[in-house]
C-alpha cells in the first residue's frame, strides 16, 4: 500500500448542536472508508449541546483530523468555506452531520470522478433512513444534473479554485448555496453529475427544521433556491423550471403554505436591482 503524502479527499462536516448525530456520522466514516484516502475536517458552528467536548475527545481517538471551533453560528457557506481553506485533498466532500456513509461509498465516488473528468461535482445517492433497504437496493445509473444536494457532494479542488467557494454573501445562513455553486460550475463549462453507486443514509434536516422552525426554514429555502436560479440561469433555462415551480406552488397551496411561498417570491422581487447586478457580474446572459 502506497501512503499518500496528502489525502485524496478532504471530508468536510459542519455541525451545529448535532451531538446526537455527528458521533454516528464520524464512526461510519472511519468504519467504511480506507484511511489512506481521506482526512476529516469538522467545523462546529457554536454548538451549545456538548458537541464541542465530544468532538475534542473523538479527535483524540482518531475520528477526525482537524476541528475548527466557531464561537457563533456562521452559517452553512462560511462554515464549509472554512473547512475548504484547511483542506489538503484534491477533492472536497461536503457531508451533512446527520448522515451515515456506507460500504465502498468513497471508492465508488472516486471511480465516477475518474470516469467524468469534466464533472466539477458528483452527488452521492441520499436515502432517508426509514426507506433504506441494503438487500434490495439496486444501482441504476449516473445522471447529469443542473445541481445536486450539498449534503453529500464531491467537489473537485481545481473547479472550486476556478469558480470560487460557496457564496456566503448572498446565501447566508443556509439554503441555495450548493445550487448556486453548481450553476456557476456549469456556466464555467463543467458538468454536474449524480450517481447511485455511492449511498449516504440521511436522518433528516436536524439542524434547520428542529432549531429554526418550519416556517422560517420553508421561506428561506425557497427564497434562496429561486435566487440561485435568477442569478445564474438563462431565460430558456429558467422557463424550463417554471413547471417545477408551479408544482411547488400547488403543493404549498394544498398544505396551507402558499402564503409562505409568496413571501419567498416577494423577497426576490423586491431585490430585483441586486439580482440584475449579480447576473451581470456572473455573465449569466439572456440566452
Residue ranges and their predicted role:
Residues 147-164, 169-204:
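A short, conserved alpha-helix in the catalytic core of glycosyltransferases
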Residues 27-37:
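Short, acidic, metal-binding catalytic loop of nucleotide-sugar glycosyltransferases
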Residues 99-134:
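Conserved donor NDP-sugar-binding/catalytic core segment of glycosyltransferases
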Residues 38-46, 66-70:
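Short beta-strand/loop segment that forms part of the nucleotide-sugar
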Residues 28, 44-53, 72, 102:
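A conserved acidic beta->alpha catalytic loop
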Amino acid at each position: 500500500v502506497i501512503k499518500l503524502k496528502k489525502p485524496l479527499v478532504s471530508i468536510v462536516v459542519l455541525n451545529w448542536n448535532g451531538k446526537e448525530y455527528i458521533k454516528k456520522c464520524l464512526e461510519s466514516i472511519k468504519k467504511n472508508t480506507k484511511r489512506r484516502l481521506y482526512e476529516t475536517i469538522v467545523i462546529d458552528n457554536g454548538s451549545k449541546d456538548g458537541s464541542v467536548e465530544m468532538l475534542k475527545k473523538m479527535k483524540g481517538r482518531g475520528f477526525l483530523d482537524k476541528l475548527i471551533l466557531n464561537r457563533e453560528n456562521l452559517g452553512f457557506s462560511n462554515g464549509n468555506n472554512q473547512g475548504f481553506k484547511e483542506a489538503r485533498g484534491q477533492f472536497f466532500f461536503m457531508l451533512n452531520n446527520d448522515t451515515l456513509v456506507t460500504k465502498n461509498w468513497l471508492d465508488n465516488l472516486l471511480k465516477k470522478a475518474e470516469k467524468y473528468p469534466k464533472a466539477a461535482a458528483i452527488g452521492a445517492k441520499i436515502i432517508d433512513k426509514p426507506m433504506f433497504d441494503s438487500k434490495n437496493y439496486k444501482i441504476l445509473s449516473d445522471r447529469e444534473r443542473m445541481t445536486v444536494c450539498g449534503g453529500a457532494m464531491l467537489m473537485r479542488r481545481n473547479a472550486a479554485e476556478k469558480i470560487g467557494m460557496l457564496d456566503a454573501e448572498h446565501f447566508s445562513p443556509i439554503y441555495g448555496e450548493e445550487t448556486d455553486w453548481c450553476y456557476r460550475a456549469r456556466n464555467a463549462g463543467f458538468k454536474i453529475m449524480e450517481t447511485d453507486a455511492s449511498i449516504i443514509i440521511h436522518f433528516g434536516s436536524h439542524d434547520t427544521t428542529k432549531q429554526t422552525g418550519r416556517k422560517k426554514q420553508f421561506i428561506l429555502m425557497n427564497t434562496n433556491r429561486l435566487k440561485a436560479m435568477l442569478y445564474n440561469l438563462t431565460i430558456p433555462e429558467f422557463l424550463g423550471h417554471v413547471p417545477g415551480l408551479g408544482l411547488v406552488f400547488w403543493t404549498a397551496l394544498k398544505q396551507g403554505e402558499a402564503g409562505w411561498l409568496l413571501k419567498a417570491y416577494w423577497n426576490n422581487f423586491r431585490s430585483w436591482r441586486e439580482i440584475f447586478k449579480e447576473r451581470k457580474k456572473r455573465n449569466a446572459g439572456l440566452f
